[in-house]
């Protein structure tokens, strides 16, 4: 079903399997080398089904179940439905930015169809969602979709629970972040906040009593995730997240033109970060769409290159990533 403030019945389970941003889509990401796509993604979800059912776990998907709001490949949607219906506990899915064409979930989005057909329970509005009984402890679960305000106080959301966990899909500044990212903050009455959206696993941050965590995506779409290990995570009764291995191939990206001497890695990393901070400061997503081919952003970056005497290796990396960003905006 689609939840807009409704609460699901409480369930007894051995924990909650947390699955980060699957990005299921029929289009193979630009530098992935997979001969057949998206079997790598579906295979990870099938492994998640096995883990959840073997260990009697409830299931939460952190958002971006789909890579595009409208998935046109009917066969792929049927395959995905078949996988998702394999869970003993129906997955609860947060709404991510890739799941929606507008600011909120609508009937035109593929994710809405899965909710209406009871394949998954989709959380469309920020609210408390359900309670789970894990051993002797009761855990309250709430969610905030992409673009909606994360609550600052969760004390009135649940009564009689031992732990409150909230799930979000936002740009959070775990490691300092970029312009526009929200620093972790204390949410009154909330013990754990688990975020999607950011694709790399982040170190947890404690703000007041609220521990913020970001497990990362299970689908590596871009080369900046070449070292990211896709995992699912089990939320236990203590509020800890335990990593679970998922099947993945290490050599899945075409790195032509992207390989840099290892001795220069730290310098390259700093220069790339500096260039992208400039990019994000210079252009909003709206302006990127307005420029169409990314020319406005490209001019800003080239000016930054000239100002900082940026190496050719870093210039090649940033230009390639900018090209990928423009392509993704064109498809969205």
Give the label of every model feature segment.
Residues 7, 251-332:
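Non-catalytic terminal accessory segments
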């Amino acid at each position: 079903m689609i939840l807009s403030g409704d609460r699901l019945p409480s369930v007894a389970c051995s924990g909650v399997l947390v699955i980060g941003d699957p990005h299921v889509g029929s289009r193979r990401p630009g530098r992935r080398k997979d001969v057949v796509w998206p079997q790598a993604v579906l295979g990870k979800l099938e492994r998640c089904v096995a883990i959840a059912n073997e260990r009697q776990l409830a299931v939460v998907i952190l958002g971006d179940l789909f890579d595009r709001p409208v998935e046109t490949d009917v066969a792929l949607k049927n395959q995905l439905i078949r996988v998702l219906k394999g869970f003993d506990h129906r997955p609860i899915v947060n709404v991510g930015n890739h799941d929606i064409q507008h600011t909120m979930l609508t009937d035109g989005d593929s994710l809405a169809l899965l909710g209406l057909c009871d394949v998954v329970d989709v959380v469309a509005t920020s609210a408390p969602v359900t309670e789970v009984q894990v051993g002797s402890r009761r855990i309250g679960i709430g969610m905030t979709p992409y673009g909606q305000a994360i609550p600052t106080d969760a004390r009135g959301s649940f009564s009689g629970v031992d732990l409150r966990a909230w799930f979000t899909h936002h740009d959070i500044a775990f490691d300092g972040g970029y312009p526009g990212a929200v620093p972790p903050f204390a949410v009154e009455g909330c013990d754990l906040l688990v975020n999607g959206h950011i694709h790399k696993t982040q170190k947890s941050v404690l703000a007041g009593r609220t521990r913020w965590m970001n497990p990362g995506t299970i689908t590596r779409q871009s080369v900046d995730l070449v070292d990211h290990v896709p995992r699912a995570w089990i939320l236990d009764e203590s509020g800890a997240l335990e990593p679970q291995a998922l099947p993945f191939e290490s050599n899945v990206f075409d790195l032509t033109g992207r390989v840099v001497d290892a001795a220069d890695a730290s310098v390259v990393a700093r220069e790339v970060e500096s260039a992208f901070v400039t990019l994000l400061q210079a252009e909003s997503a709206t302006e990127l769409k307005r420029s169409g081919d990314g020319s406005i952003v490209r001019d800003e970056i080239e000016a930054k290159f000239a100002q900082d005497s940026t190496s050719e290796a870093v210039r090649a990396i940033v230009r390639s990533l900018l090209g990928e960003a423009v392509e993704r905006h064109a498809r969205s």
